[in-house]
Amino acid sequence: MIFGSRRRIRGRRGRSGPMTRGLSALSRAVAVAWRRSLQLRVVALTLGLSLAVILALGFVLTSQVTNRVLDIKVRAAIDQIERARTTVSGIVNGEETRSLDSSLQLARNTLTSKTDPASGAGLAGAFDAVLMVPGDGPRAASTAGPVDQVPNALRGFVKAGQAAYQYATVQTEGFSGPALIIGTPTLSRVANLELYLIFPLASEQATITLVRGTMATGGLVLLVLLAGIALLVSRQVVVPVRSASRIAERFAEGHLSERMPVRGEDDMARLAVSFNDMAESLSRQIAQLEEFGNLQRRFTSDVSHELRTPLTTVRMAADLIYDHSADLDPTLRRSTELMVSELDRFETLLNDLLEISRHDAGVAELSVEAVDLRTTVNNALGNVGHLAEEAGIELLVDLPAEQVIAEVDARRVERILRNLIANAIDHAEHKPVRIRMAADEDTVAVTVRDYGVGLRPGEEKLVFSRFWRSDPSRVRRSGGTGLGLAISVEDARLHQGRLEAWGEPGEGACFRLTLPLVRGHKVTTSPLPMKPIPQPVLQPVAQPNPQPMPPEYKERQRPREHAEWSG
């Protein structure tokens, strides 16, 4: 029995589960609609307040009507029982030859016959009469009519010589339901004769029910009308607000010619005028900023192109002098080396400015091919590895054992990695720099982690700004121009990828490049975490398959590097 009871309990829980979930979902949907819809809140509050007022008024009016109907009934019943008492006294005091029971029955029949509408009697309506003489000692009580329907409390008042009335539910041969029972003692030769009249309240109850139904129907119709009125009134406010919201969204999307329609001279019209004035002012400012931006980009592009021709001439002359520097005295030889070095930096700056101008103008294009990104990482390490060797910084490389094929512009991705590794070397403080790669089904990520000075709060975004430097006094070992990370983040966006930064003061920094494996796909997640998991960082064996930079990287270095990377 216990087990059966448990099974039944589990069954009830199982059946109530979907209903509970459905109610929960419905409540959440209603809550969302309540928060998001001003019109719904206005209509609901209007209906709620109107319902409260209608209920209060309905209760008051129903009470007033009920009391009025019953008061009329009571007054008519009092008049009726006064006449009935006179009639009973005349019959009982008439012939002495009749027995008491016969006299009581005759009086009852006479009273009930007067309720016939054709006789013009019965002002309070139809009624039934009860006559009773209580028993005294051995003498039994004499009654006429349904004496058992008279409440004992009412009989107590009448025995005390008082006229009284009471509402009660009765069941007689001709009527069953609520009734008004009124009683009074009579003045006759028969001592303690009591007279009671039972007035059914069927007609009064029907009248009150009709009034209540009419008021309920009227209240329901009034609620519907109020809901429609509230809906129309709130619509006059909500529609312009929604229109302003839609126009503001389109304005934010770049449709600067969008304006709100102005109708009339009310508050909404003034709101539309103010909104249009604001939109016009913003449009002018945006147009001015676009014009200034175009002028700036055109100036940068023109200056870069104009400087390239004389720079090429100077470069040829400098290379010629540098090739014969062995024939010069030491002072001139040193000057020649400095000139060539600064020309390298100047040429890199011009290349970066041209690249930035192409990104700003929106003409930068990808030369996509399917490549193994491990090779791209190795090429980047080969170009900047000598910087780590000169600074005494160990490069720890962790690459997958399998190929990582991605559809990318290998030149741009390699430039991103060169910039990230060179930037890490500049800020590593003679501590190792770790390069990791991982891939999943859709994306590939490369992180470059250093354990140097790190980044202060808020610098994760500033680090990608043009010419921004966290510490202007720090010397760049890589000789960068300050545009490398700005170009890198644009190259990442061109691939529909992400370039992100994290850092803490004294803990170092981590830059993460995430790219889609297939061109056109968007990056939603990254296979590598941004914030590194705490672990020993000074030991190369702390990561699986860590390895220093291979020796062949050193053989690939040239005396003078003309790569496109910058710090």
From Swiss-Prot:
State which Enzyme Commission number(s) the record gives: 2.7.13.3
Here the segments flagged for biased composition (Basic and acidic residues) are 552-567
Q: Which GO terms describe its molecular function?
A: ATP binding; phosphorelay sensor kinase activity
Query: What SUPFAM superfamilies would the database entry show?
Result: ATPase domain of HSP90 chaperone/DNA topoisomerase II/histidine kinase (SSF55874), HAMP domain-like (SSF158472), Homodimeric domain of signal transducing histidine kinase (SSF47384)
Q: Where is this region: Disordered?
A: 1-20, 526-567
Matching entries from InterPro entries are given as: HAMP_dom, HATPase_C_sf, His_kinase_dom, HisK_dim/P_dom, HisK_dim/P_sf, MtrAB_MtrB, Sig_transdc_His_kin-like_C
Where does this chain mainly localize? membrane
**Domain Histidine kinase per the UniProt entry, residue ranges:** 302-519
Q: Where in the cell is it found?
A: Cell membrane
| Subunit structure of this chain's protein | Interacts with MrtA.
Q: What protein am I looking at? A: Sensor histidine kinase MtrB
* Species name: Mycobacterium tuberculosis (strain CDC 1551 / Oshkosh)
